[in-house]
């Protein structure tokens, strides 16, 4: 009996030494202080009084909007600074024969990481993911990791960046034999052929005979292919395995059916698995054609995409999968099929969701190269870091089937020989960047490429060395063939930002080059605000150098207002839709975002560009796209029906699957309207009278659907509506609070102050109302209604049972809603 027990213990110890790598979240039990001292890196520093929190965390979003914040309105008018994060931890199963790493998905910015007082490294770029090895300085107990985050020199970004460890952190333990960090590159063709390049590190001091077992699993975890390979790896050497496999009858990854597979790679020493590494991938084919545009799996289609910045509204830059999913789900319902990551590598969660939900992705590296756009931006670090940062982005992301395009930059000033934004304010720089510059030449007589063209080629070469399977582009706002990025002839895909008037010349200027609108539209809208007459299109500002003022700090929710360099939604879509060679577009933007409040300055502090506002309320133009991009029946009538007696009102309607629509006011027809060529809405100009306005859609003489809007009475009560009635522990619930009349109609002019409180296992983590100029804090338990509504975001604690949210307001009946827990 004793012999059996001893054998079991020895076997257990032997097995533990061969256990596979582990990668665990390292987000909890951090300490935080918005202060700076060199002593804070020391493991002996007393941090007992520091704030306790969990990651991801963005300290800027917790602050007040102020005109004096150095980020300026373009950066969201929120504070920056220097802060430290510290975490005390043990490693219960500490093994001297293992290697330990810490992975940061993203820290903004200039993050210096210390372990037990030893500097592991400093990374300037706030949007890149990276890893440090901790092994030499790690102990079994009483470890301290300390991270100094420096976002004090501002402005350094043309939009809201956030501050802090705003993405997830992971603790990784590996055996001496393991798949390298981002060490797989999987390509798969529609006929089922899979090729995998797999890099295996031998960090031991001996030669190792390694067996590599690869297994492909489908979405139901069924094994569909296996193979084994063997190599001898010398000490402290990284070996490359080139593996070929076959899956019979693979299910393809597509927009409609985003089928995913997993390559499970097992590193074996003898018969023992010492490391397991999983890579998600998909089978698909695609190409861009200079005459016919974009093709996916043999199907010609348009890329109906949007650009999005990385913030999550009232949550700031702090990553949460539920909030990203909410953004993508609303865009998917609109018919959007593509995301441009503007203008930086995104959170891994976004790419994972794009894989599983069926979005095409344009993954972008930088907003600037050598030449700065703001005083303290990444251009200061570009020469020292661009090769590593660009390489790391591609290595991290290249297995995602959703990514079909790499972008090496956005509106970089290297398009021109002489272009400089150094002496401009961020607001001026944003405007001039889209206005263009004079083209000059300094190429030598012998045809040598301009230095900016050489840099373009160098960056494309870096991408192609790591991934030759995808096209490379850049978002260019200089449409001339003399653009120095285009002159490099290195870009596979010509990308224009705006300039729809130049698109007709693309086939002539760039023969045999495929084309896509890398950025388009830049229309300006505030949810619920309408400027009439609606057929008067407003440029704001009229020219990029002109000021624009409006005491309301709002923009029209009709599609009749856009920035000086841009165009309306309808006019842009008409060009994209009716030119076969245009592969598609990425609209600026899918969602409003913090910062860049064109055309205004402070107190405006978030953008007007989105199809969906910052709180997640769709603007009316959302339904124009839904009517064009989906097969869903659409009949959207706007604006609301609460005006002054006799006031002349323009009623718009977006619709599809009908020949004509007829408007009625209190039962009296106002006429039948048909869509005109190159227009995507119909309009009636009518005189307001209280009651009901109704629109009826006809097809082949039959009524197919109808909708109506009635005049709302005085505010009577609050109505709470949850987008999701259940929530996982640690998950988010998004709850709309509306001010309604006694009959339940939303009061479109209501601006009541609403107060919120929770009961149970959870907390309020953010409030918003979609206003681009509200000075109210996002981290609060109250919010004014904006055109009759606002948003409350609650987080369910873990473990969770249920959470009640109560809303009240002066002279308003209260409401309560319950969010149940889900597993």
What are these regions (language model features)?
Residues 199-289, 687-690, 709:
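Extended acidic/polar, glycine-enriched regions
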């Amino acid at each position: 009996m004793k012999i059996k027990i001893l054998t079991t213990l020895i076997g257990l110890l032997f097995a533990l030494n061969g256990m596979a790598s582990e990668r665990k979240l390292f987000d909890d039990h951090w300490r935080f202080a918005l202060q700076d001292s060199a002593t804070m890196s020391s493991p002996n520093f007393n941090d007992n009084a520091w704030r306790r929190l969990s990651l991801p965390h963005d300290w800027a979003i917790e602050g007040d909007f102020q005109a004096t914040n150095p980020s300026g309105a373009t950066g969201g008018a929120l504070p920056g600074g220097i802060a430290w994060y510290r975490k005390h931890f043990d490693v219960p199963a500490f093994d001297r024969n293992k290697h330990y790493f810490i992975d940061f998905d993203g820290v903004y910015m200039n993050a210096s990481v210390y372990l037990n007082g030893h500097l592991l490294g400093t990374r300037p770029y706030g949007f890149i993911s990276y890893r440090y090895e901790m092994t030499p300085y790690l102990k079994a107990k009483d470890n301290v990791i300390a991270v100094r985050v420096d976002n004090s020199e501002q402005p350094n970004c043309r939009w809201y960046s956030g501050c802090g460890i705003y993405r997830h952190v992971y603790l990784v333990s590996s055996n001496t034999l393991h798949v390298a960090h981002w060490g797989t590159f999987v390509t798969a063709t529609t006929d089922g052929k899979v090729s995998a390049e797999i890099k295996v590190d031998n960090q031991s001091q001996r030669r190792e005979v390694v067996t590599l077992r690869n297994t492909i699993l489908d979405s139901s975890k069924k094994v569909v292919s296996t193979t084994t390979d063997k190599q001898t790896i010398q000490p402290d050497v990284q070996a490359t395995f080139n593996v070929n496999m076959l899956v019979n009858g693979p299910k393809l990854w597509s927009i409609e059916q985003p089928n995913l597979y997993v390559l499970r790679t097992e590193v074996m020493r003898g018969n023992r698995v010492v490391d397991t590494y999983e890579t998600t991938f998909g089978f698909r084919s695609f190409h861009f054609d200079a005459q016919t545009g974009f093709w996916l799996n043999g199907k010609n289609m348009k890329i109906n995409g949007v650009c999005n910045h990385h913030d999550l509204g009232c949550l700031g830059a702090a990553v949460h999968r539920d909030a990203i999913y909410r953004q993508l789900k609303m865009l998917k319902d609109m018919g959007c099929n593509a995301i441009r990551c503007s203008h930086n590598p995104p959170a891994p969660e976004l790419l994972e969701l794009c894989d599983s939900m069926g979005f095409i992705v344009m993954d972008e590296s930088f907003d600037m190269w050598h030449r700065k756009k703001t005083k303290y931006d990444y251009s200061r670090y570009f020469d020292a870091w661009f090769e590593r940062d660009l390489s790391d982005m591609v290595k991290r992301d290249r297995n995602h089937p959703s990514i079909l395009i790499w972008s090496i930059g956005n509106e970089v000033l290297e398009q021109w020989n002489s272009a400089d934004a150094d002496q401009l304010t961020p607001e001026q720089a944003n405007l001039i960047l889209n206005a263009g510059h004079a083209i000059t030449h300094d190429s030598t007589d012998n045809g040598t490429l301009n230095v900016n063209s050489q840099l373009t080629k160098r960056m494309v070469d870096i991408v192609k060395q790591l991934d030759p399977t995808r096209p490379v582009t850049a978002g260019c706002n200089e449409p001339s063939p003399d653009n120095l990025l285009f002159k490099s002839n290195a870009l596979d895909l010509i990308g224009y930002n705006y300039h729809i008037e130049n698109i007709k010349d693309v086939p002539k200027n760039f023969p045999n080059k495929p084309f896509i609108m890398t950025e388009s539209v830049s229309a300006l809208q505030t949810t619920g605000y309408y400027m009439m007459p609606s057929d008067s299109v407003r440029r704001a500002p009229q020219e990029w150098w002109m000021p624009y003022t409006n005491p309301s700090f709002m923009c029209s929710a009709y599609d009749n207002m856009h920035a000086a360099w841009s165009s309306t939604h309808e006019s842009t879509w008409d060009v994209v839709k009716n030119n076969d060679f245009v592969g598609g577009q990425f609209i600026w933007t899918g969602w409003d975002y913090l910062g860049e409040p064109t055309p205004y300055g402070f107190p405006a502090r978030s953008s007007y560009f989105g199809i969906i506002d910052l709180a997640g309320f769709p603007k009316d133009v959302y339904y124009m796209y839904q009517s064009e991009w989906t097969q869903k029946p659409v009949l959207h009538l706007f604006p609301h029906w609460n005006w002054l007696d006799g006031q002349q009102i323009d009623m718009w309607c977006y619709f599809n699957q009908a020949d004509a629509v007829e408007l009625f006011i209190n039962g009296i027809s106002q006429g039948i309207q048909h869509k005109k060529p190159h227009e995507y809405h119909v309009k009636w100009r009518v005189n307001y009278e209280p009651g009901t306005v109704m629109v009826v859609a006809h097809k082949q003489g039959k009524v197919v659907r109808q909708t109506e809007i009635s005049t709302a009475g005085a505010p009577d009560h609050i109505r709470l509506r949850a987008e999701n009635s259940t929530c996982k522990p640690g998950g988010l619930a998004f709850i709309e609070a509306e001010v309604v009349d006694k009959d339940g109609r939303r009061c479109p002019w209501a601006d009541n102050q609403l107060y919120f409180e929770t009961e149970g296992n959870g907390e309020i983590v953010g409030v918003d109302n979609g206003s681009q100029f509200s000075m109210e804090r996002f981290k609060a338990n109250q919010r004014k209604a904006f055109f009759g509504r606002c948003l409350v975001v609650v987080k369910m604690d873990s473990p969770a049972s249920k959470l009640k949210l109560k809303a009240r307001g002066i002279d308003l009946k209260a409401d309560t809603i319950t969010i149940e827990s889900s597993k």
